[in-house]
């Protein structure tokens, strides 16, 4: 009887606790489900990005500091200037990620160009232009430029003031249909400083490396959620991975590649359950190096049947690759996190529906890691060329990295965390109500 009485007295508080927990679990479940629909998310800018306004001339250019990330914007036909104060020993790398706003239209030749110039408008080591390409689908694209210290072809070798020039490129309005949107693009600027070597070495690129196309990995794919920007990229290692991607969506992944290792990747877009037609460039996969410099990209058409695209063979990571004239080789000059960026054209929805569509990534990292070059100082940020930085990265058959969220990205884990905090808070409150109610029932009525 005592036990029955206790359960009867606790019945109402238990009901309260159960009701609250069920409601909270339902809310958490709906939040997680919403995160898993594959709905395109806006670009995830670095949380610590400093807002900065580009100047229309060099006189008012704002100084950028190494190791920092900045957020700016670039208008139509825009040309903006930012200032660098450089020494005579370090290499400076600047990358600008252009992000068209939702609903924008872009043409094949629309893009962003980045260069570093001296006080006489002379271009320094390199400048690049990133285009949206044949997909004509708005998505984040990044271009990079540098001031490098070295012999021969290198200019801008002295310490002093230099300028980053970010330009918006476009074809004449009369040559494209529909015309590009005049809206401003958001910009994310990153600045990395690389120290000189302790001892000067070779100044020519390696002439011999294994350029045969590697076999794509086989095996069951494990789920891994891509991020919505460079700073939220999902961690991958060697293995077969799967995700979902919706038309108009861009997914970011990062893969650690050490000195002497050779990277390769294949992306596969799964078959559609309906629709018809053909798109010449539906899926685009791009590879960026640790300073967000474009190394290579590849595209694939789509007719509703499964399609795949593989990067052309890349050389092992070597310091001396920088002396090559081919971007695909010279870009593989650093150890660190390499970024796989996958975009599915928005126009796919018109022919095959809103998705999400199945995406499989087959990632290889061949070769043993070797000791890197002896730098005379530290890079800024200091861990940018360290592939072991951060959470342990999963390899085929290995462990899922801590903090990566397993098969989910940071957004889902934040939702789970918020749900967990909410559940815990409500549980504590409910238990408090239960305790008070139980004490009142246990107290003699004459009290």
Label each region the model flagged:
Residues 2-4, 31-80, 102, 124-139, ...:
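Non-catalytic extracellular/lumenal accessory regions of secreted precursors
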Residues 69-71, 103-145, 278-315:
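Surface-exposed beta-strand/loop patches in noncatalytic accessory domains
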Residues 90-92, 151-175, 261-263, 329-347:
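Noncatalytic modules at the cell exterior or secretory-pathway interfaces
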Residues 91-103, 263-272:
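A short beta-strand element within beta-rich, extracytoplasmic domains
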Residues 253-414:
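Membrane-proximal extracellular "stem/stalk" segments
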Residues 418-447:
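C-terminal membrane-anchoring or membrane-association module
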